[in-house]
Every structure is written in C-alpha cells, then in structure tokens.
Amino acid sequence: MTPSLIHPGTRRHVTIVSASVGAGHDGAASELARRLGEAGFTVDRHDFLDLLPASLGRLLRQTYALQLRAAPESWERLLIALDQHRRLAAAVRALSGLAARRLARSAAGSDVVVSTYPLASQALGRLRRRGALRVPVVTYLTDMSVHPLWIAERADAHLALHPTAAAQARRLGAADVRVCAPAVRPGFRPASSVLERRLARLHFGLPDDDRLALVVAGAWGSGDVAATVRDVAASRLATPVVVCGRNTALREALARSGVGVTLGWVEDMPALMRACDLVVQNAGGLSSLEALASGLPVISYRCLPGHGRTNAAALEEAGWAPWARRPDELPEALFAALTAPRAMGSSGAADPAAIVAALATGRDSAATGRPASMELSEMVEASQ
C-alpha cells in the first residue's frame, strides 16, 4: 500500500478521462487511478464517449469496432487522412468539443485532469484555451506511436512510454514531453519459480511441457487472429494459446478448428502470461506492455492496419519487440524469442502517477531518470 502523499486536512482531486474503445485506454486509466488513490488522492474517472451528446459516443464505439472487423484498411486510411488533411482533422477536433460542456462540469474542483484518449485531450485543450479549465491537463500517451490527434494545443504535459514516442510527440509540437514508465498493474511480473509457472498452466488447463505462444488481439479479438494461430502452429516451435476476448464468434471458430488452445475473456491475465513463454500481438497496445512487464518476449505479427502497424514499428525501433512482417519471417522470430528471450526490465523512468501527483500538489520538478518506485517514495517522504 502506497503511503499518502496528502497532508492531513487537505483534499487533492484528480479527474481521469479515458474511453471504452477496446481496453487499452481504460486499462491505463484504471492503473493510474489505483496508484493515485492509494497515494491519498480523490480520483474520479469518466468515459469520454459517455460525455458526448445523445448516443453519439455509442455510435463512435460501434463504428470503430465495425471498421476493425469488416474493413480494417479503412481505419488506416482514415488515420492517414487525418494526418494529411487539416480540414478533416479540424472537423474531428470540433467533434471532440461536443463533450466540452459536460467535461468542464466533470472536471470541476480538480487539481489536475489526465487524459488517456486523444479526443479527450482535444476537448480538454479546448477548455484550457477558453479559460474554462484552469488546472493542468496531462495527456498519458497509451501508444508507442503518436498520431497528431493525441497532441492538443494547451495540454500542459505529455507522458510518453519511451524516448521513441517522446520524440514523435515533440515533432508534432507537444508541450512538456516526459518519458515515464508504463502504467501496468503490479500483478504483471515474471514467474517467481518453475513451480509457479506450472501451477499457472494447471489452472488454465495448458500443456505442461510445451513451449506456449500467447496470441493476443485486444478485448475485441480484432484482426486476422485465425491465420496467426495457424502460422504459429505450423512453425512447430510453439503451441498457440489464443485469447479471444469478448469475440465469441472467433472463439467458437478457433475451437472448432482444433488448433492450439482457445480461451475467451480472461480475468487473470497476469497468471496466464506467467504460464506462457512469449506473446504474439497485433496492436502494440496495453497487452504488449503487460507482456514485457511479465518478462516475456513479444513479437508483432499480422498487425492491425493503422495504429497496429505504427505501434509495431515504434516497438521495433525502441528495441522492445521485433516485427515479423511476413509469414516466412515468423519462424525465425519465434526461434529467437524462445532461445534468447529478453525482458524489458526497469526503464528507470518516472512513475506516471508520481508526475500527476506532483502537478496536483505543486511539487512538480519534472524530474526523470530515477526508478518509478523511488520517485513515488521520495514524494511520500517530502509530503511527510
């Protein structure tokens, strides 16, 4: 339990705005909220899509899911168009402004507001420009690649997961970019012993002696997951264990195929990762960071158009995960991962929750380069 950062008799209030599109934005928000709550802050969380008028938020969520399922290349084309055409980008920023009034009410009384979703950052930046929000706005960049929509004018700070992402954010004009450690739940850690890994395999009914490749595709089971499972199995280097998330149709189809081990929605992902030897992913989001925190090598393969491919490129540039771009590259990547696995380890970057806490309490020194745990403990000592 983290000691309180708040002096007795004071109240510090943090508002976090995410979005229920997949699980990555909400996952980061949830972990930030947990850390800040344990440090003594009052934390409110809001779904940006719920702040949009009428049923617009639900429509956006459904449209995005449909794009990824039925026409994934259209999502990539849209992201490229938003990058290249100012009028289209301006229209999307204006769309985010539809939530501004409710967002201003939701953030009232906060000492700092954190966004883990691009459109929320745009709406908060708009409020800052108009003087309707007078406290710092912090954007936590959930992806390793940074699209221009992430960067909002008048956002006070941007937290990037790696110098690669930080450099992209700076090129796009982001203010006060800082590198932080990923906001990953502490349960994601390497197995402490062979026995712990075997018990995890027993819990999920997994083969005890096989090399296991965990195939992840987000909460929606998006992408060409079936082909990935077949390709991993065909390599004869590992048995695929696929997590289908909430995609019931995918789970049923893979179960009928009889290839590998098929799972649906898994609550205890930390234990499942400790049961496996490597992770094959297609989006480059939170699951990749959780795998690295668990000491597992990660391979990007059959990546989703758009953010999946740009994240894969950034992960590869950072040295965190190779990208097998073609089926004939997968066996070599699997062999390398299984014979010389590399864990991400401690990055030495600041705890993002500590940065937010410092901004909320007026103790911000923009200090980086120290282990995240030391950063938080030093703030605790200073507050006491």
Task: Please state what every model-predicted region is.
Residues S110, A155, C276:
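An anion/phosphate-binding loop that grips the pyrophosphate of nucleotide cofactors and donors
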Residues M269-T310:
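A donor-sugar binding/catalytic signature common to diverse glycosyltransferases
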Residues E316-W320, R325-P341:
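C-terminal "capping" alpha-helix adjacent to the active site of nucleotide-linked donor transferases
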Residues V194-L202, L206-C276:
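Donor-nucleotide binding loops and adjacent catalytic segments primarily
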Residues G345-Q384:
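C-terminal alpha-helical cap of glycosyltransferases
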Residues A100-P118:
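Short N-terminal targeting/anchoring amphipathic segment
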Residues G131-A191:
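Active-site-proximal region of nucleotide-activated glycan assembly enzymes
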Residues E31-S106:
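Conserved N-terminal ligand/cofactor-binding loop architecture of enzyme catalytic domains
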